[in-house]
Amino acid sequence: VRGVRVVMIGGTSNTGKSTVAGALAERLGFEHRSTDLLARHPGRPWRTPEREVPAHVAEHYTTLAVDELIDSVLAHYERLWPRIEELVRTHATGPGLVLEGSALWPERVATLDVPHTAAVWLTADEDVVRARIRAAGRYDAATREERFLTDKFLARSVRYQSLMVEAVDRLGPARVDVGKDRSVSEVADAVLAQAS
């Protein structure tokens, strides 16, 4: 990635952005950051060993329709954009950065007039996204209510990817399909090839 100081990796939830970005950052000797850590928005609506689903997160997914969930998350990403842009500008002339997150919306990234940057979006077939989200949410052991929340998150994630792919294909940035069985190393190689 000659000359590139910031590699941005976008994509919907559970496409492997964090894992691939971590591997890529290690390979390049760059810092790895996630846009998810810049501000809070109702995230994944399933229990983990460390936490229960907060009431406001459950309410968010229970009460909003899929299009409203999309509008909500895109509005959140729009509010977050100035911080993302500042981070990209700072690292474009300084220490290298691999920045990943769903907040890297193609239409906003396309407006960046910052040298030494590259952007790639990860995509996956709906079956892959579904399997990964259901595995993360322990769907098979979940209650009916927990499955409902996971299904809403899945529907939002699939819709997000559909809109994102339309934007990426229209604007021309690169995208990499993570496939069903591609290794992290293979996806990282493909991202590097697209970012060069």
Segments the model singles out, each with a brief description of its role:
Residues 9:
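Hydrophobic anchor at the beta1->P-loop junction of P-loop NTPases
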Residues 116-161:
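A glycine- and Lys/Arg-enriched "phosphate-lid" helix/loop adjacent to the NTP-binding pocket
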Residues 17:
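Conserved lysine of the Walker
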Residues 41-96, 103:
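ATP-dependent small-molecule kinase phosphotransfer cores
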Residues 20:
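Hydrophobic positions on the alpha1 helix immediately C-terminal to the Walker A/P-loop
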Residues 28-46:
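Short beta-strand-centered segment that lines the nucleotide-binding/catalytic pocket of NTP-utilizing
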Residues 12:
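P-loop (Walker A) phosphate-binding loop of NTP-binding proteins
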Residues 162-196:
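NTP-dependent small-molecule kinase module
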